[in-house]
């Protein structure tokens, strides 16, 4: 089947926001107006189209990024609805990795909130162009210009309104288009009857002022427009739109729109802005990757004529068709029934069927083209972040960064029957979600699961119960500490066993140095002259990786360390992979004596909003919890405090804050980074590990 929409007419966008900004409702309205659904489902009634897991409908939040294809103004728009809750950050990360543009939804009463900052930072890292939709203009306390000011103050974003609201709260009845300089007035509740009128007299002066600011801001991003502007020539609407498009795609400018998705106002104009200002796959730089055969960098321009290259960004288990692999096609064409090479794993995979998804219903298609997002059935070895390519034109695309889990729980099956099922269930859930880890404690045999937060693990345990019918007892949440080395050192690992029969011999010298935070473990082979034969090098790396899983101080994984194998020796007969694995682990133990090992703990960025009179209490709470205040700002009668606090000190804080503020205080926390624990705390953790505490 020929391509239905050209690449110029394709948009791959994400909808991202803080929890409760109205993101799912906004997506829902997009589907309504693009003709994908006939009845609108309200999130607070638990009937939303995109939120298709039972847990999502119960909790009224989006957990997995559902991918949907819609059509608007002769364009295809592929939409990924991402969760706003901090515990599901990986869902946002992986959708941003495969998108070309995004719509950031704000709650107009609150403006930029903590999770908005997190997703904004991630989108900036990936260079994703964005437009901003200030939603909930019908809500009490809605303030459009305050929301715009938070984009400047909290995100340092070059954001400017291209619309202004007519009225606010109950009186919100229309939108001023600052490009056409016309007013759109809504006359019914479905947002389908819209009158275009002249701007009401009482709003004209404000509209002219903001139009002037918009023209100036756009002109600053473009030399030709700047010349016209300075010479006093009029900039036409077409030139202004082209300038906004160019600056938005270059991530130099962020257009701000307003509306109320719940009241069906402003969504169609936002869809127009998606088409007008967000990029097609042709507008963004060609994807880069490494050819695994030559180690050279290669690019894949967005074109059907190029060899096939795609990135798998999500695995889901569907109750009807089994394992679904969502992928974004960057170049080339793929037919169902054909074979591809998973270059990340070096495995050949057969594409059984190709499905295009609409929330949780699906349509089978024969062919996918460059720029498409689809799901494949039948891939056995592919996981999140893997590259799928033409077998004759290999390329490994940049993968998806997976954040380290910060919290862990012990789970134990209630019966023998549950035990067997639990292993399978946990393995399937871990395949779907790379931030969910399953480990068995070597000493106690207990199963430990770790993830990004309490809600994250709650949802997974709940899914284990519902989808896999596994009943389990769950322990109290524990912090996922990490260990690292703070000094460079060299150490020898020597293993020799010769007692009848085949002996064992492995001898290595390894230099350990601290690595940058977040870089993980890096191994370098610097052996010259074959003193350790090539076939044993992978065994040395494997031995280190395995022993780093249980650290040297308190059994926590060792992270952010570089290991350079630079010398060693072997025995013609007695050397084996096993011997070199053991030698590597002995070198690590030896290194620990002089490498200044340290325990790291997750630090959370905590944002606490309280009435003015409770500010003193909150400052006391932060100090008592080993936290440090990063900043404060007033918003109405409330104070917003931002602080870095160790996760270990935050358990039970909701209750403390509730009683201190008579239930009026709220807080949000987002994982920010790992940091050394103080010496006294480190000693406590080590004692506890040894069973002395």
Swiss-Prot record:
Pfam families: EFG_C, EFG_III, EFG_IV, GTP_EFTU, GTP_EFTU_D2. GO terms for biological process: ribosome disassembly. InterPro entries: EFG_II (IPR041095), EFG_III (IPR009022), EFG_III/V (IPR035647), EFG_IV (IPR047872), EFG_V (IPR035649), EFG_V-like (IPR000640), EFTu-like_2 (IPR004161), G_TR_CS (IPR031157). It is found in: Cytoplasm. PROSITE patterns: G_TR_1 (PS00301), G_TR_2 (PS51722). It comes from the Bacteria. One of its GO terms (cellular component) is cytoplasm. GO terms for molecular function: GTP binding; GTPase activity; translation elongation factor activity. Keywords: Cytoplasm, Elongation factor, GTP-binding, Nucleotide-binding, Protein biosynthesis. GTP binds at residues 17-24, 81-85, 135-138. Residues 8-282 form the tr-type G domain. Its main location: cytoplasm. SUPFAM superfamilies: EF-G C-terminal domain-like (SSF54980), P-loop containing nucleoside triphosphate hydrolases (SSF52540), Ribosomal protein S5 domain 2-like (SSF54211), Translation proteins (SSF50447). PANTHER family: RIBOSOME-RELEASING FACTOR 2, MITOCHONDRIAL, TRANSLATION ELONGATION FACTOR G-RELATED. Catalyzes the GTP-dependent ribosomal translocation step during translation elongation. During this step, the ribosome changes from the pre-translocational (PRE) to the post-translocational (POST) state as the newly formed A-site-bound peptidyl-tRNA and P-site-bound deacylated tRNA move to the P and E sites, respectively. Catalyzes the coordinated movement of the two tRNA molecules, the mRNA and conformational changes in the ribosome. Belongs to the TRAFAC class translation factor GTPase superfamily. Classic translation factor GTPase family. EF-G/EF-2 subfamily. HAMAP family: EF_G_EF_2_B. This is Elongation factor G. It comes from Streptococcus gordonii (strain Challis / ATCC 35105 / BCRC 15272 / CH1 / DL1 / V288).
């Amino acid at each position: 089947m020929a391509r239905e929409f050209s690449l110029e007419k394709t948009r791959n966008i994400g909808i991202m926001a803080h929890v409760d900004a109205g993101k799912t409702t906004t997506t829902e309205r997009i589907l309504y107006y693009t003709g994908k659904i006939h009845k609108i489902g309200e999130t607070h009634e638990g009937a939303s189209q995109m939120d298709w897991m039972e847990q999502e409908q119960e909790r009224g939040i989006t957990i997995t990024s559902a991918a949907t294809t819609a059509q608007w103004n002769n364009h295809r728009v592929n939409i990924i609805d991402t969760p706003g809750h901090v515990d599901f950050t990986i869902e946002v990360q992986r959708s941003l990795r495969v998108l070309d543009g995004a719509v950031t939804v704000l709650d107009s009463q609150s403006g930029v909130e903590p999770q908005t900052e997190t997703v904004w930072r991630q989108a900036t890292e990936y260079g994703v162009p964005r437009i901003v939709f200030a939603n909930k203009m019908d809500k009490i306390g809605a303030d459009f210009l305050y929301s715009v000011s938070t984009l400047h103050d909290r995100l340092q974003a070059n954001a400017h309104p291209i619309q202004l609201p007519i009225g606010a709260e109950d009186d919100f009845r229309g939108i001023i288009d600052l490009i056409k300089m016309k007013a759109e007035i809504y006359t019914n509740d479905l947002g389908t009857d819209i009158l275009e009128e002249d701007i009401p007299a009482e709003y004209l002066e404000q509209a002219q002022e903001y139009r002037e600011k918009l023209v100036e801001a756009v002109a600053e991003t473009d030399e030709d427009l700047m010349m016209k502007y300075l010479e006093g020539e009029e900039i036409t609407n077409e030139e202004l739109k082209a300038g906004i498009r160019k600056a938005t795609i270059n991530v130099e400018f962020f257009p701000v729109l307003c509306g109320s998705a719940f009241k069906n106002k402003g969504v169609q104009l936002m869809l127009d802005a998606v088409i007008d200002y967000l990029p097609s796959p042709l507008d963004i730089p060609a994807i880069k990757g490494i050819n695994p055969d030559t180690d050279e960098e290669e690019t894949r321009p967005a074109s059907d004529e190029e060899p096939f290259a795609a990135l798998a960004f999500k695995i889901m288990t569907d109750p009807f068709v089994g394992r679904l692999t969502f992928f974004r096609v960057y170049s080339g064409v793929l037919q169902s029934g054909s074979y591809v090479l998973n270059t990340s794993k070096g495995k050949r995979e057969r594409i059984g069927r190709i499905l295009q998804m609409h929330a949780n219903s699906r349509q089978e298609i024969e062919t996918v083209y460059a720029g498409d997002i689809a799901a494949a059935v039948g891939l056995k070895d592919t996981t999140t972040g893997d590259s799928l390519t033409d077998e004759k034109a290999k390329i490994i695309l940049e993968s998806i960064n997976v954040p380290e889990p910060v919290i862990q729980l012990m789970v134990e099956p209630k019966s023998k029957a549950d035990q067997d099922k639990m292993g399978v269930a946990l393995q399937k859930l871990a395949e779907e979600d790379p931030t969910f880890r399953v480990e068995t404690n070597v000493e106690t045999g207990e199963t430990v699961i770790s993830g990004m937060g309490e809600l994250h693990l709650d949802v997974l345990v709940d899914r284990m119960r519902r989808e896999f019918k596994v009943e389990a007892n769950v322990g109290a949440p524990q912090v996922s500490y990490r260990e690292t080395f703070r000094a460079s050192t060299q150490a020898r690992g020597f293993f020799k066993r010769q007692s009848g029969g085949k002996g064992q011999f492995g001898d290595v010298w390894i230099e350990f140095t601290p690595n940058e935070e977040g870089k993980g473990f890096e191994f370098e082979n610097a052996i010259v002259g074959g003193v350790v034969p090539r076939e044993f090098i992978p065994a040395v790396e494997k031995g280190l990786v395995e022993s780093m899983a249980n650290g040297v101080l308190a059994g926590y994984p060792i992270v952010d360390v570089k290991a350079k194998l630079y010398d060693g020796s072997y025995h013609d007969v007695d050397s084996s992979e096993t011997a070199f694995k053991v030698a590597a682990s002995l070198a690590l133990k030896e290194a620990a004596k002089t490498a200044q090992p340290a325990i790291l703990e997750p630090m959370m960025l905590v944002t606490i909003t309280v009435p003015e009179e409770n500010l003193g209490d909150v400052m006391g709470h932060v100090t008592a919890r080993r936290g440090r205040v990063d900043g404060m700002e007033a918003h109405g009668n409330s104070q917003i405090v931002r602080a870095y606090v160790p996760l270990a000190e935050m358990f039970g804080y909701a209750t403390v804050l509730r009683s201190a503020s008579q239930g009026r205080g709220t807080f949000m926390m987002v994982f920010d980074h790992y940091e050394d624990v103080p010496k006294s705390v480190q000693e406590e953790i080590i004692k506890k590990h040894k069973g002395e505490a």
